[in-house]
Swiss-Prot record:
It comes from Halobacterium salinarum (strain ATCC 700922 / JCM 11081 / NRC-1). Binds 1 zinc ion per subunit. InterPro entries: aa-tRNA-synt_IIb, aa-tRNA-synth_II, aa-tRNA-synth_II/BPL/LPL, Anticodon-bd, Anticodon-bd_dom_sf, Beta-grasp_dom_sf, TGS, TGS-like. Residues 242-533 are annotated as: Catalytic. Residues 1-63 form the TGS domain. This is Threonine--tRNA ligase. It is found in: Cytoplasm.
Length: 640
């Protein structure tokens, strides 16, 4: 029998028989590990412990102590949900039920569910878990599998697509339930300590709006009930912080039906925040030596064919015909920047050339995937591109790392860093990939950055450094990125004249400090719970006259505060009501002015933490405001 070589996480290797399973490898390593095996990772892909190994690979054993265990548990929980739904609605047609970052879902056809249904499904699922049913993998002949799903066109389509082939197909069973599935799963339903059905939504089969409409049932699961309750508490807090809710309450943005899906309108308050965000990175770009450029929203599709986007992204592009010529709204800014570079004549002494643009782009996401500002059709990227010599990459990346770290620290966002390396399908020589990955590693190591390596997760055109950050609720988001690109310079024939007077191709560096403004704005709304730092707040100071007799002085105080965003509360309300309203509006500072303050040419300062300081000299407050805003401090601190 032939053998294969498996490489373990520590770099050691084992020779095992071809066809041996992940579990067999675990037993080969040690009997204890074999008993504890839940699943495995083959070449970084999560697989069932029963998965056979037919070729040389890297392998990692997953136990209940592994980070991936939660994914496996939730995959089984999705089957528990499907089993409960089928018991409650025997006519329901099951489609797919994957695990997700926060739980799982199952898409079903031929049924609609209301709140009472969800309660009954929750109770049924609890019974299935209490029964501690064994979860077992079985294999069916392909013809038998098709016969099994004679009345389920969705499962038959999966058999003909993802599960296509000549061999048997795997199912997982638990009690009276079985489902077409490649795994992995835990050993029994009783391993699920906490289970909750969350909500439903509409979905489309295959994410295609032209296909069947389905009901998507969301749930989550954890090893313990206490883990579940902690999650549910965070989820309730997240609902209170939901940027869509706060966006309405604070008059930041709207997405009305009349404008179309995924096309946000920014109201004056929201635009104020976005303008401050833009001015901040504009200053950083200037310090780093970037020149601001601007490209149109619309290009001939010839540009997108040259860049490769037409081949890879045409289904996500908005296309239109103009005088029998095809144009496309830009899904990315980089081809425009490459074209600008190509319009010049460059020497090696001119490099690096750095461009940046707050560029609006358009991507046609499926309507069912659109959500507030997190997934939209039209969004703006703080896009930057560097055209550099290979020997300049390290210095450029180091400076970008410093700047990105400064940005995330400014907003008090915790972050993680990952180095994504060469994927199987890539462009560029081995030498330039090795050099580029080495340079990125050296930058990360020299700066003492704690980072993970994500093998094969780089873009096809070059390796990248990804920043993922966490908000105040501990949720993870994709953040800034630094990517090296060998593909676009080649496609656009970019060149510069080297010291040898020959033509050379520059390396292109893509970078974004925020990513999408929309996504970053959404994160900040929820991260701060609408309580923006003073420098970002749409209204920084509200002046509260005690009576109408103090209105004149209130306006004089406003004038003294110059260009700050200051409003005078002139409604005929009590001071208490004015203070409460300012708190509700998340205004950082309130200045109460009555006869005593007017006589002393002073103000009484209150902040949104409900602290108060009486008889404050206005010049003193103004000087502190200057310092707080210039320093971009995260909380009002005059009264500290």
């Amino acid at each position: 029998m032939s053998s294969v070589t498996v490489t373990l996480p520590d770099g050691s290797t084992l020779e095992v028989a071809s066809g041996a399973t992940v579990e067999d490898v675990a037993h080969e390593i040690g009997p204890g590990l074999g008993r504890d095996t839940v699943a495995g990772k083959i070449d970084h892909e999560l697989v069932a412990k029963e998965e056979p190994i037919s070729e040389d690979c890297e392998i990692e054993i997953v136990t209940d102590q592994s980070d991936e265990y939660l994914d496996v548990l939730r995959h089984t929980a999705a089957h528990v949900l499907a089993q409960a739904i089928r018991r409650h609605h025997p006519d329901a047609k099951l489609t797919i039920g994957p695990y997700t970052d926060e739980g799982f879902y199952y898409d079903i056809a031929n049924v609609e569910l209301d709140a009472d249904d969800l309660d009954e499904i929750q109770a049924e699922a609890a019974s299935i878990i209490d029964d501690d049913l064994d979860v077992e993998r079985v294999e069916y002949d392909r013809a038998d599998a098709r016969e099994h799903y004679a009345d389920n066109e969705f499962k038959r389509e999966i058999l003909d697509a993802e599960a296509a082939g000549d061999g048997p197909v795997s199912f997982y069973t638990q009690g009276d339930f079985e489902d077409l599935c490649k795994g992995p799963h835990v050993d029994s339903t009783g391993e699920i300590g906490g289970f909750e059905v969350l909500e439903t939504s509409a979905a489309y089969w295959r994410g295609d709006e032209e296909r069947e409409t389905l009901t998507r049932v969301y749930g989550t699961a954890f090893p313990t009930e206490s883990d579940l309750q902690e999650y549910l508490a965070r989820r309730e807090e997240a609902k209170e912080r939901d940027h869509r809710k706060l966006g309405r309450e604070m008059d930041l943005f709207s997405i009305p039906d009349v404008t179309g899906p995924g096309l946000p309108l920014y109201h004056p308050n929201g635009k104020t925040v976005l303008r401050e965000l833009s001015e901040y990175v504009r200053g950083l770009n200037s310090e780093m030596g970037y020149d601001e450029v601007e490209t149109p929203h619309l290009f001939r599709t010839e540009l997108w064919k040259q860049s490769g986007h037409y081949d890879n992204y045409v289904d996500d592009m908005f296309l239109l015909d103009v005088n029998d010529e095809e144009y496309g709204l830009k899904p990315m800014n980089c081809p425009g920047h490459a074209t600008i570079f190509n319009e010049g004549s460059w020497s090696y002494r001119d490099l690096p050339v750095r461009y940046f643009e707050d560029g609006k782009v358009y991507r046609k996401e499926q309507r069912g995937e659109l959500s507030g500002l997190s997934r939209v059709w039209a969004f703006t990227i703080d896009d930057g591109h560097v055209f550099a010599r290979a020997d300049q990459i390290e210095a450029e990346v180091r400076r970008l790392m410093d700047t990105i770290t400064e940005v995330l620290d400014t907003f008090d966002l915790d972050y993680e860093v990952a180095l994504a390396t060469r994927p199987e399908k890539s462009v560029g020589s081995d030498d330039i990939w090795e050099q580029s990955e080495r340079q990125l590693r050296e930058v990360l190591d020299q700066q003492g950055v704690d980072y993970d390596v994500e093998p094969g997760d780089g873009a096809f055109y070059g390796p990248k450094i990804d920043f993922g950050f966490e908000d105040a609720l501990g949720r993870s988001w994709d953040g800034p990125t630094v990517q090296l690109d060998f593909n676009m310079p080649d496609r656009f024939d970019l060149e510069y004249t080297g010291s040898d007077n020959d033509a050379h191709q520059p390396v292109m560096i893509h970078r974004a400090l925020y990513g999408s403004y929309e996504r970053f704005f959404m994160v900040l709304i929820e991260h701060y719970n609408g309580r923006f730092p003073t420098w970002l707040a749409p209204e920084q100071v509200r002046i509260l006259p005690v009576t109408d007799d103090n209105l004149g002085y209130a306006h004089r105080v406003k004038n003294e505060l110059g260009d700050y965003r200051v409003e005078v509360e002139d409604r005929d309300w009590t001071v208490g009501k004015k203070i409460q309203q300012a708190h509700d509006d998340n205004v950082p500072y309130m200045l109460v002015v009555g006869d005593d303050e007017e006589d002393a040419d002073a103000v009484s300062v209150r902040d949104r933490q409900e602290r108060e300081g009486k008889g404050v000299d206005l010049a003193e407050f103004r000087a502190h405001l200057d310092s707080e805003v210039d320093g971009k401090r995260t909380e009002p601190d005059f009264l500290d």
